[in-house]
A protein has these predicted regions:
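Conserved SAM/SAH-binding loop-helix junction
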Residues: 142
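Conserved G/P- and acidic residue-centered "switch" motifs that form tight phosphate/ATP-binding loops
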Residues: 139
Length: 168
């Protein structure tokens, strides 16, 4: 044996397998339902478990409706958008998620005033019991900057805040 497994993952799409691989066993329906219902959108990660998260823009990795349903399953009540193109407020309202927009140009940093304003808003929303997800396009650059800013706002030193946000 060469250390490779010749059996594909259950539920693997046939078009993703090479010609020599056997067909994948279908994932049982209960397992499919559980897998879909037990996680947030792809790339969704908690900074503060159950309170504050980062995520890619809903609809950028998967179907918009699926991503919004996944955010709702995770308990998200407010989506903070950092993209210049606004989210569809009607789609968010349809699943009961509020929306805050604070556009930051892609590959740019927020101004100090904008970062501080967002931190104040996040603190207020958390104090009111909101569960927040912050997003930009990929959920990395602008999202990570705001999440690190929030940690600094809480009193963490900058290096620790950056390292923590990078893990998200």
């Amino acid at each position: 044996l060469n250390g490779n497994c010749t059996v594909p993952t259950p539920g693997a799409e046939p078009e993703t397998l090479d010609d020599e691989s056997p067909a994948s066993a279908p994932l049982p329906e209960p397992a499919r339902r559980y897998a879909k219902q037990s996680s947030g959108p792809r790339g969704f990660l908690w900074l503060r478990n159950g309170v504050l998260a980062g995520t890619p823009r809903p609809g950028i990795v998967a179907d918009l409706d699926d991503d919004l349903e996944a955010l709702k399953r995770m308990g998200v009540t407010t989506l903070v958008s950092l993209t210049q193109t606004p989210m569809d407020s009607a789609a968010l309202a349809a699943v009961g998620i509020g929306h805050v927009s604070s556009p930051i140009p892609d590959m740019a940093a927020p101004t100090i005033e904008q970062a501080a304003g967002l931190c104040r808003q996040i603190v207020t929303m958390i104090g009111a019991g909101e569960v927040i997800a912050v997003h930009c396009r990929a959920g990395l650059g602008r999202t990570g900057t705001i999440l690190a800013s929030y940690l600094i706002w809480e009193g963490r030193d900058a290096l620790d805040a950056l390292e923590t946000a990078r893990r998200v």
